[in-house]
């Protein structure tokens, strides 16, 4: 599913300005850019675009209230200065599984005054010597890197087992309901085009059916009457 269609699906007739959370995971951006997301999403606080084939966040709109941004499993290699310009209140950023190779690529994040948590799992930069020390030195206001603070204390609410229980428990039932609603809404989107195409054909069929429903004798009288009216009009024109 492309990103624009997924946006419509997630909104479900809500106004963009009212949305506080938006999940676009696993949809596709053919050109590697963010598509369809605009500054109308001014109230957005959580945005997830995991595995959407992103190469860049250059066209990310201004989202002044955004606090948490999930960008894992994409192909982003730089251009992070955009985040400082357009998401000034960001507190959590997940760039795991991207093409971040050098510490200096993260330098623009210094301009995010509220950034507390940064995840870079499965990025090449994590293989560098003194990786953790270097990141904490570069970003002194950062509290957690890859789920741990500078003293290797684990961040709260990051227990994988607890998260699994929540996802497989109550959230599991909600996810099933959401999936069903998404399928229904997606079918409605697909049916809209078919309905528009079918309306013209139905109009033509209705006209044919109207003629067939009229008894043959009455239809003959109606045709003769129409012809008579045309002859009278011709006579009046001659006079």
UniProtKB/Swiss-Prot annotation:
It comes from the Eukaryota. LRR repeats lie at residues 16-40, 43-64, 65-87, 89-110. Residues 149-239 are annotated as: Disordered. GO terms for biological process: regulation of apoptotic process. Residues 149-215, 226-239 have a biased composition (Acidic residues). GO terms for molecular function: histone binding. Residues 123-165 form the LRRCT domain. GO terms for cellular component: nucleus. InterPro entries: AN32, Leu-rich_rpt, LRR_dom_sf. Histone binding is mediated by the concave surface of the LRR region. Multifunctional protein working as a cell cycle progression factor as well as a cell survival factor. Required for the progression from the G1 to the S phase. Anti-apoptotic protein which functions as a caspase-3 inhibitor. Has no phosphatase 2A (PP2A) inhibitor activity. Exhibits histone chaperone properties, stimulating core histones to assemble into a nucleosome. This is Acidic leucine-rich nuclear phosphoprotein 32 family member B. It comes from Xenopus laevis. The gene is anp32b.
